[in-house]
Amino acid sequence: MQVPMSSYLVEIKPQIQELIRLLEREFDYVSVLCTDVKGTTYRVSMHQTTVGDYHFCERGFVVRAWQDGSYTEYSFNNLTDAADLAEKITSALKSEFQALKALGIAQMESPLVQEEAITKTMQNEIEIDPETVSAEEILSHLRKLCDAGAAHEGILEFQSTVSFARVNKLFLSSKKDLMQSYAFSEGSLSAIGTENGKQNMSYRSCSGLKGVEILNEMDAIVEEIIAVLYAKLHSDPVTPGMYDVITAPDVTGVIAHEAFGHGVEMDMFVKDRALAKEYIGKPVASQLSSMHDGAVGAQQVSSYLFDDEGTLGTDTTVIDHGTLVTGISDLVSALRLGTTPTGNGKRESFERKVYSRMTNTYFTAGTDKLDDMIASIEHGYLLESVQSGMEDPKHWGIQCMVGLGREIKDGKLTGKVVSPVTLTGYVPDLLKSISMVSDKEELFGSGMCGKGHKEWVKVSDGGPYLKCKVRLG
């Protein structure tokens, strides 16, 4: 089925167009982003059942205006008479300009955006609309998954969770008329178990531009998550050192996200907080590796027609056969840098500022087979079950927490597991050590990405299996 447009946004569109017309009497440029995001999260564990709003639910508006070389914004969620609202917004924005001037605070100037006229809409397709399925049916399915996991020996807690989201956005200016409605789903299973006084946990997820059909994907994860849990319960600590490793697609994705995801967010170029700014056009990785980011390069939870500034989504080649080509950018950063925006301007909500943010970030597939990659390693590990990652864009250090590593000796998996594993290194050293790339890629979109300690947005990341050399501890 095709995801329907928000009836609310369709209804209020003429009023927003009138608001823009009135504000343009006072400002040289005016745009309005209208958001209507809804969704539900269902969770069943061995001890409780909960149903609540999806994390990013919102309904509101952001006005952006340009005057005297600077942009300013006003957000609100109470839509009143257009004339009254225009007067209120004009007064607030003019007062802000005057206050800054009175205090002697210099404003960061930005060129006036030159928009091209465009009218475009997008609606994605899903199989089963969550709004046509009762909460009881969804919870019943989750309960069966929970019961199946809890039935295994040593399980202290098992939890099944699914979220259904519907994102509706309308972007209007004097030249742009953009509207989109897309749905995505996220499912996850987690288990905590114990054996011989040792306790551990495992987690698996799935996501995509899907509806209730994602529950069927979750059915296949139960036995997988239990197997991983038991492997971790029988694991040993890794001996610290440098190793040849193969990163599973989920680990590859976090490396992409941390290494040259945050590192090439171009609002950091404006602030001179990213080393990547000095390496555009230079080799930073193995010639075997290429990396992309973009809302249209892959079909996952961060695939959209336009970003929160009305820039159409793109497929950006960040690294091309080892060479750093470009970064990813919001509109205002691009205007300040004299570059082309890439459709990566995203807000946590209508109440928050736009930043350069990732969408779907991934290494592209190569030509190698996983079996051949394993056979090429004398002693190392197959790393899987990523937990978290962190990178320093200013100095290119990277750290990833990985759930487990499967030992490889003389080209074969030994059955021995080490856990937990911390992967660390200097980003160019890690990426230049890539010597094999598998022929299939996979993306994951069940998590969120923050900017520093805040500004959470939906992203996905992934890629193929990579063979590289890293430090483990």
What are these regions (language model features)?
Residues 1-473:
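N-terminal small-residue-enriched
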